[in-house]
Amino acid sequence: MAKERACRHCHYITTEDRCPVCGSRDLSDDWFDLVIVLDVESRIAKKLRESIPEAAKVPGKYAIRVR
């Protein structure tokens, strides 16, 4: 099973070597807590974008904190 890593730029969680959302290769194994965004127009997605501007632009799993 592939290890999930979080993008340091947009916080998207992926098993790939490149972030499918922003294209960054700067991924981390050291991330905490996650939010699953189904609707990018939801209040939670908008709140997430307030603290992480690049986050929650597409549905998926996002890390709250990435080191």
Swiss-Prot record:
Listed GO CC annotations: chromosome; DNA-directed RNA polymerase complex
Record Gene3D superfamilies: 2.20.28.90
Keyword ATP-binding in annotation: no
Predominant location: cytoplasm
Reported consequences of knocking out the gene: Essential, it cannot be deleted.
KW Zinc (keyword) present: yes
Localization annotation: Chromosome
InterPro entries hit by this protein: RPABC4/Spt4, Spt4/RpoE2_Znf, Spt4_arch, Spt4_dom_sf
Binding-site positions, Zn(2+): 7, 10, 19, 22
Keywords, ordered alphabetically: Chromosome, DNA-directed RNA polymerase, Metal-binding, Transcription, Transcription regulation, Zinc
SMART domains the record matches: Spt4
A single GO molecular function term of this UniProt record: zinc ion binding
GO biological process annotation, one example: regulation of DNA-templated transcription
Protein task: The Stp4-Spt5 complex stimulates transcription elongation on both naked DNA and histone-bound DNA (chromatin), facilitating transcription through the histone barrier. Neither protein functions alone. The complex also stimulates the transcription termination activity of FttA, neither protein alone stimulates FttA-dependent termination.
PANTHER family: TRANSCRIPTION ELONGATION FACTOR SPT4
Subunit note: Heterodimer composed of Spt4 and Spt5. Interacts with RNA polymerase (RNAP). The complex interacts with FttA.
Protein family per UniProt: Belongs to the archaeal Spt4 family.
Record-linked HAMAP family: Spt4_arch
Protein name: Transcription elongation factor Spt4
Natural source organism: Thermococcus kodakarensis (strain ATCC BAA-918 / JCM 12380 / KOD1) (Pyrococcus kodakaraensis (strain KOD1))
Organism taxonomic ancestry: Archaea, Methanobacteriati, Methanobacteriota, Thermococci, Thermococcales
